[in-house]
Amino acid sequence: MKVFEMRAFTWVITGLLDSGKTTLINRLLKEELSDTNVLVLQFEEGEEPLIQADNVRKLVFSKKELEKEPFSVAGKVILYLEKQPADLMLIEWNGIEHFHTLEEMFLSSPAQMVVTVARLIYVADGGHMESRIMDAGLPTFSQIAGSDCAYIRTKSRHSRSERKEFLHSCNPGIKVYTSHDWKHFRREFFAVKFY
């Protein structure tokens, strides 16, 4: 493998199915990253399609590929980036897959020379969030524990404190934002450019 001349700064967006991961990615792409060359890796596809734009490319991998050949998947990503570099890579991670699989693929293999994970965001739907997380088990807790911040889709502005308390029990340092806090989330998230 040739020496890779550019690191792919990476944001990992994780959460359970139907939590709003693609919705958040689409909003980031439309409102914040429209001038950025972005590669999106999807390890699950929800109901909402990823937006199509000139600056957005995507690679989709199935759960079966991820489980059987995670290092082959990482190798394909590296080869793709060698041919078509990106300013930023967004990984839409499978919400019930152990986070250590992602770490092994991109942080403790040859891919670590290419990939720099700069942000890890846990996305949740505020409706029945706690019970869905409890039912999902250990992989979900490991994702929350490793996340920098959480973005929660809520219908009510008043449910933030309850959600925050629950997430802090998994990760005391996690910053919690709701869909009603977009300006605060944006300001915090883009205070420092990682790409």
Describe each PLM feature range:
Residues I13, H158-Y195:
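P-loop/Walker A phosphate-binding loop and immediately adjacent motor/lid segment at beta-alpha junctions
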Residues W93-N171, K175:
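Phosphate/Mg2+-binding loops and adjacent switch elements
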